[in-house]
From Swiss-Prot:
PANTHER family cross-referenced by the UniProt entry: ATP-DEPENDENT RNA HELICASE RHLB, ATP-DEPENDENT RNA HELICASE RHLE-RELATED
Name of this chain's protein: ATP-dependent RNA helicase RhlB
Gene: rhlB
Family membership noted in the UniProt record: Belongs to the DEAD box helicase family. RhlB subfamily.
Catalytic activity: ATP + H2O = ADP + phosphate + H(+)
Annotated disulfide bonds: none
InterPro entries in alphabetical order: DEAD/DEAH_box_helicase_dom, DEAD_box_RNA_helicase, Helicase_ATP-bd, Helicase_C-like, P-loop_NTPase, RNA-helicase_DEAD-box_CS, RNA_helicase_ATP-dep_RhlB, RNA_helicase_DEAD_Q_motif
Keywords, in A-Z order: ATP-binding, Cytoplasm, Helicase, Hydrolase, Nucleotide-binding, RNA-binding
Length: 421
């Protein structure tokens, strides 16, 4: 398989339902990515799939295309009731569920299949109103799905297609019992099409596939390299005292069009936000306690380009489909080596190049050996001149409600470069 972003395989080459092909081509999707080219022949033949591919390689469109085709090509279960969806797509986070729903809308519009969305933290009655009118494809997080199921707002007895997206993250967040609860209320595995996708598929995820799927075919793209080959990786060793100034200096000299900065704690994210906002950057903050409506607004502003920088905990590392992220900064090296892969996977997506810069400080440098062992290579080290770090920095802002703040639009040119030669 070629390592280019797209293969020579076209969606129109497959025996897909004409309405699905029409919807894909209307959105500009003509050629398959490698994971799509591997998955579609299997799902079109009714085979279950457990797929591993790096983020940004088209996993979402692979399972959406398969789901819509299957439902259009197979009749609904006899005597199906209005509260019985035909397909269930489970995601680990609210943001990912919302994005999958958005990606599915063009296909729903073209095919007439109805979508439903179920996630916690917001919109209970609004979501329920849609479900009560009847949906074909239900996309959601496990907690809200179980809530609706226990109250009989939904019944899973007519499910024909099941998708688990970011399955390893489901384990990380402790949702495996919820997943099994939902599976027990569906028809047997051999009476439905089952798909599981993730950037990493650990032994425990393969065990789940064996348990809940029907002889799933395991497929993977570029297994020998866990980090995208279009992502330039770079590592610095700052002292704790120089770490913030190094970050701000790097931002000034890189001048990223769109960057995500990851830190390991909510407090650290707020600290970074305060420094960057005070320095005039258009920066948003995304941590676990930000209200759902505000989270979606921040992501929308970042996607539109109204924000240049997003500071986030790992709540934003998995599954977010934000286009054209040019830089990822690991202000803290993550404690979980898999999170390193998912963090830097926010850049270098859809065939574009990207740049990942990590700071191995005194506190988190101990995480580096496990990360490099996991990704299978050493991260190239760059040096900096401590005397050239920025010093003309304003006092950081203190976070007050609302939790996001936009500095003025960045104008002019970056400050002079400050790296050592």
């Amino acid at each position: 398989m070629s390592k280019t972003h797209l293969t020579e395989q076209k969606f129109s080459d497959f025996a897909l339902h004409p309405k699905v092909v029409e919807a894909l081509e209307k959105k500009g999707f003509h050629n398959c990515t490698p994971i799509q080219a591997l998955a579609l022949p299997l799902t079109l033949a009714g085979r279950d799939v457990a797929g591993q591919a790096q983020t940004g390689t088209g996993k979402t469109m692979a399972f959406l295309t398969s789901t819509f085709h299957y439902l259009l090509s197979h009749p609904a279960i006899a005597d199906r009731k209005v509260n019985q969806p035909r397909a269930l797509i489970m995601a680990p986070t609210r943001e990912l569920a919302v994005q999958i729903h958005a990606d599915a809308e063009p296909l729903a519009e073209a095919t007439g299949l109805k979508l439903g969305l179920a996630y916690g933290g917001d919109g209970y009655d609004k979501q329920l109103k849609v479900l009560e009118s009847g949906v074909d494809i239900l996309i959601g997080t496990t907690g809200r799905l179980i809530d609706y199921a226990k109250q009989n707002h939904i019944n899973l007895g007519a499910i024909q297609v099941v998708v688990l997206d970011e399955a390893d993250r489901m384990y990380d967040l402790g949702f495996i019992k919820d997943i099994r609860w939902l599976f027990r209320r569906m028809p047997p595995a051999n009476q439905r099409l089952n798909m599981l996708f993730s950037a990493t598929l650990s032994y425990r995820v393969r065990e789940l596939a064996f348990e809940q799927m029907n002889n799933a075919e395991y497929i993977e793209v570029e297994p020998e390299q866990k980090t995208g080959h279009r992502i330039k990786e770079e590592l610095f060793y700052p002292s704790n005292e120089e770490k913030m100034r190094l970050l701000q200096t790097l931002i000034e000299e890189e001048w990223p069009d769109r960057a995500i900065i990851f830190a390991n704690t909510k407090h650290r994210c707020e600290e970074i936000w305060g420094h960057l906002a005070a320095d005039g950057h258009r920066v948003g903050l995304l941590t676990g306690d930000v209200a759902q409506k505000k989270r979606l607004r921040i992501l929308d502003e970042f996607t539109r380009g109204d924000l240049d920088i997003l500071v986030a905990t790992d709540v934003a590392a998995r599954g977010l489909h934000i286009p054209a992220v040019t830089h990822v900064f690991n202000y803290d090296l993550p404690d979980d080596c898999e999170d390193y892969v998912h963090r830097i996977g926010r850049t270098g997506r859809a065939g574009a190049s990207g740049h990942s810069i990590s700071l191995a400080c005194e506190e988190y440098a101990l995480n580096l050996p496990a990360i490099e062992t996991y990704i299978g290579h050493s991260i190239p080290v760059s040096k900096y001149n401590p005397d050239a770090l920025m010093t003309d920095l304003p006092k950081p802002l203190r976070l007050t409600r609302p939790r996001t703040g936009n500095g003025p639009r960045r104008t002019g040119t970056p400050r002079n470069r400050r790296r050592s030669g």
